[in-house]
């Protein structure tokens, strides 16, 4: 009887632990299944161009420009406020407060304005005691309260940074905000920004909708190419609902040439990276708009198959990047990272096609089609430029 009683207690204990693990696992995956980020997020973020020089007028004007330019109609929906929007001290109730001098109407009024334009409003906080600017408090230890505050303001997106983190692992800090958002009563996109320090691709898919794989991007060729390579390492972890994030776009900020920005946008699109514009939308020039509004390139990024393309071939400075698309298509980039024009070739076996396949090759930047291409695709590519294609198999 004693043995039977012990056995029953052990079984009950084991069952309790197992059910708890199942429940915890289910809860951890619920945020990923919040119905958001079925394709990579598209929108705008204030940091790259404005850093702390932000106010509610700028955010409203940016929302206006997103609509009037036509960018919102092709998928750019998030207007994301980055660091420096809040007061240094919380209020008497312990809540975050919008900075009176720059956001006098408050975040709720701003959210209402952005929503009235058919857009979504994002905001920024930090999994530490202060944000990275050290001008406002972080959310560490205030996750539930801040998540409810964000929800009450109508926030749609949270970028969650990693400064002033007390030396605690992000694996301990980030799930707390994930659960808080889950319990906030509002579906809020959760963007983890721990700079790839603890390989978030391997664990963040159960916690958030995207995760930074790298440090901050800079508006220059060296930074952009380095980050593209670092992000490529984690390609197999991306999936609908959870994406690798190599940081925001620098297109239009002036530090690179047109060809370099074209390469930047093309690689980000193929890599299923978030397409978050980082320039001043109110004054972007024609070239910037044409790059950011290329519907054919954007379609690769937003393809419903949701498989991240990656580097498949490297010969010195000449590279081939490729990835599968829906309807058995393939996206291909021929990228010249060198200083002289060069021919680049992608052979069918290198990009997932059969040697017998005959394809139509659609040039996504020239908006032209090459019919009945066999065995390989070649092009002369200018320095720091790329060619981007979608390949569609022809029926026998």
UniProtKB/Swiss-Prot annotation:
GO MF annotations in UniProt: alpha-galactosidase activity
Highest taxon listed in the record's lineage: Eukaryota
Subcellular location: Secreted, Cell wall; Secreted, Extracellular space, Apoplast
GO BP annotations listed: carbohydrate metabolic process; cell wall organization; leaf morphogenesis; positive regulation of flower development; response to fungus
Keyword line: Apoplast, Cell wall, Cell wall biogenesis/degradation, Disulfide bond, Glycoprotein, Glycosidase, Hydrolase, Secreted, Signal
Signal peptide (from-to): 1-25
Record's protein name: Alpha-galactosidase 2
Organism from which the protein derives: Arabidopsis thaliana
């Amino acid at each position: 009887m004693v043995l039977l009683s012990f056995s029953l207690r052990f079984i009950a204990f084991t069952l309790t632990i197992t059910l708890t693990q199942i429940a915890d696992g289910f809860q951890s995956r619920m945020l990923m299944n919040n119905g958001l980020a079925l394709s990579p997020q598209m929108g705008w973020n204030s940091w790259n161009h404005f850093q702390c020089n932000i106010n509610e007028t700028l955010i409203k004007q940016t929302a206006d420009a997103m609509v009037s330019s036509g960018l919102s109609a092709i998928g750019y929906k998030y207007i994301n406020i980055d660091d420096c929007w809040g007061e240094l001290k919380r209020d008497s109730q312990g809540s975050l407060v919008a900075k009176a001098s720059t956001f006098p109407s408050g975040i709720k009024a701003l959210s209402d304005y952005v929503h009235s334009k058919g857009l979504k409003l994002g905001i920024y906080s930090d999994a530490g005691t202060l944000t990275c600017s050290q001008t406002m408090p972080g959310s560490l230890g205030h996750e539930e309260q801040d998540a409810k505050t964000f929800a009450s303001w109508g926030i749609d997106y949270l970028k969650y940074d990693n400064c002033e983190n007390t030396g605690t692992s992000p694996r301990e800090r980030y799930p707390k905000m994930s659960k808080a958002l889950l319990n906030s009563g509002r579906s809020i996109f959760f963007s983890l920004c721990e700079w790839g320090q603890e390989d978030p691709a391997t664990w963040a898919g159960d916690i958030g909708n995207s995760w930074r794989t790298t440090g901050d991007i800079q508006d220059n060729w060296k930074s952009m190419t380095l980050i593209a390579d670092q992000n490529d390492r984690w390609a197999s972890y991306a999936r609908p609902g959870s994406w690798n994030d190599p940081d925001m776009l620098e297109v239009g900020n002036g530090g690179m040439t047109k060809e370099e920005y074209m390469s930047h946008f093309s690689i980000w699109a193929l890599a299923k990276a978030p397409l978050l514009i980082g320039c001043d939308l109110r004054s972007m020039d024609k070239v910037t708009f044409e790059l950011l509004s290329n519907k054919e390139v954007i379609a690769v990024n937003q393809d419903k198959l949701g498989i991240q393309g990656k580097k498949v071939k490297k010969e010195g400075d000449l590279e081939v990047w490729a990835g599968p698309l829906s309807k058995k298509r393939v996206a291909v980039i021929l990228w010249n990272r060198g200083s002289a024009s060069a021919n680049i070739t992608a052979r069918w076996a290198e990009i997932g096609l059969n040697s017998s396949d005959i394809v139509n090759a659609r040039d996504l930047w020239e908006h032209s089609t090459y019919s009945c291409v066999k065995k390989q695709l070649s092009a002369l590519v200018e320095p720091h430029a790329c060619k981007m294609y979608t390949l569609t198999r022809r029926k026998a």
